[in-house]
């Protein structure tokens, strides 16, 4: 079994590890131009961004070929997912690949412009994350065939947001998310921000006003990994609702670097 995943702060890597099999990071696969995926079972585990899939996931899926007897998709989300799984199924269907099983997992949301991390962390117990994962793992082990039903409102929300996000102006706006980042004097130049970026959008070799500090480009994926994983909490977003940071406790920063580094 092969799992194609995308992670920013560890949630989707953790879910992928719990499912098991050979874990393949989408940013690494994209960088290495590995588009032929073959296996008895192939799974796609990704987060929900703006009621749809992250652009990096869409970009990769549109280039792949999949040969498998069993295909499943899992999407993690914080509050609302809309019809986020639908774009994946549509892309794969155009390639002649039918999804056998799809499901969702509600987890901690790390999107700082919308959520106070203090409040998000308090919801962890109520979300029964481990129970959700256990159910999905069992379903996959049993090769269950069932797709998550998506209502009309959910489909509509995903369609509308998808058109905005994936349009040329929408894409450009997302890529410029890092224009709203700023770095404090707490920065030590450790380069973790550079290594966890799935787009190679951070250059720690540059200096800002003669001080160590990352230089952000215009290829941001809006995953906020660089902000959340900074060990000194030195990177901030002007529109953030919280200075508290999040990383899935079951995943190490080193694992996220291995998954995302473009260096």
What are these regions (language model features)?
Residues 118-121, 175, 179, 212:
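Short amphipathic alpha-helical segments at helix-loop
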